[in-house]
Swiss-Prot record:
Name this polypeptide is given: Metal transporter Nramp6.2
UniProt function note: Probable divalent metal transporter.
GO MF term set: cadmium ion transmembrane transporter activity; manganese ion transmembrane transporter activity
GO biological processes: iron ion transmembrane transport; manganese ion transport
Annotated glycan sites: 371
Species per Swiss-Prot/TrEMBL record: Populus trichocarpa
Amino acid sequence: MASSQQEQQACEIAPASRGNSNRIAALNLDGQSPPCIDDYDQQKPGWRKFLPYVGPGFLVSLAYLDPGNLETDLQAGANHGYELLWVILIGLIFALIIQSLAANLGVSTGRHLAELCKAEYPKYVRWSLWLLAEVAVIAADIPEVIGTAFALNILFHIPVWAGVLMTGLSTLLLLGLQKYGIRKLELLISALVFTMAACFFGELSYVKPPASGVLKGLFIPKLSGQGATGDAIALLGALVMPHNLFLHSALVLSRKVPNSVRGINDACRYFLIESGFALFVAFLINVSIISVSGTVCLAKNLSPENADQCGDLTLKGASFLLKNVLGKSSSTIYAIALLASGQSSTITGTYAGQYIMQGFLDLKMRKWLRNLTTRCIAILPSLFVSIIGGSSGASRLIIIASMILSFELPFALIPLLKFSSSNPKMGPHKNSIYIIVISWTLGFMIIGINVYYLSTGFVGWLTHNNLPKVGNVIIGIIVFPLMAIYILAIIYLTFRKDTAVTYIDPVKNDPNLEANMENGQGKSNQEMAFGRVPYREDLADVPLPE
């Protein structure tokens, strides 16, 4: 009798379905003790239980290897050596924490971040958050546009501005090919990206950076030299992207999760393991790129030709860093991998934009139309800068876009931290006190750096530019109120009390379920044992690698 009660307690009750809450009750209330979903899962080997959850983390991690990351890594290494490696370490640790929180939020609530923002905030606030999220998607697409244009320039000697125009068609072609085998296409793209990573690993073993310098850069925070703060913010912006939080919280909804509290907890743990492995690989790649760039460009015996390239190191000219490994074919292989990096990151950006629009506005667009809209907007500044400033101007635009992403981060991060720590949103799955303290501390540290750089950088520029005094006054009148609005918006999101309830206790909120419990009614053994459904069937068509 006691063992029967223990078995019944082991089968937790899942929340009942309510509107968009996508929870399906699976109550075991028969007189017998049928096998519950967790018992069914325990019959599987551990790796077989883990494999169905593989996919979202790796797809999201492609954003950590996009042209924006490559550009900021290359310039950080060329300008500051190993000094900013600690930014990569902290940034990816923070990325792992918040990406796992985004996954937990989706699994536990059955809704993704954009949908929860719509349910929580007043009309004008959620419209503002939607616009900021769309700006983040566009800012993230700018490095992909420029990186693809550089790759086409290297491969076919097409002018950068013409390559920018051609990027509007390249990704549309890639999206069109998905129907012929998305998993094969993603495998090809990932293979090309990791080929470039392998090249940098090989170059790393050739140039042999000093281990003491690398370790010092990783574990001793330091910001010295001209532009170090700006480069650090650009690194953070390239690593921790706002649209990735919306993307990850939605991608996990395409997975089938057992209808039990334990099943939800296991899913969250599996998504954490998958994200941790994917981000660890991304961490090694980013560290190797900075180390190679720093070692080559700061070498005492650097040739005059390489010294000129290091002085203005861009994505276009970075292939010389791989000559020791690839020889004469370095530029071609580098360009192909750069092209793959830009295209794969753009596909993830397209999905993120779809989820943002669907969540905030209940509006869905076809993938090709969504991509074309975003790409056309991103092409405009890229085209203008590439015509006026050439390759160096386009590279500076990548850094600016990464900084914009860093400044945009609080408007996705703060809602995520609040929702994932909220009992009305998450119920028993909310963050522990340790995660709350760590995540908010790191979040406010990044926000503080952004505000400090925004204020000091603008004031420094305002006092040292060559504009007439009247022009400075007009610019100050426009910019200072915007800075105040930025800070006030962060304060509002931080201290506003959440009101919307998304977690539903099945027994307390459904009198019928409680009555069924009292009457001994419940599902059949077969339904109980195999009661698996996608949390979100409307999102289950997202093409993820198996």
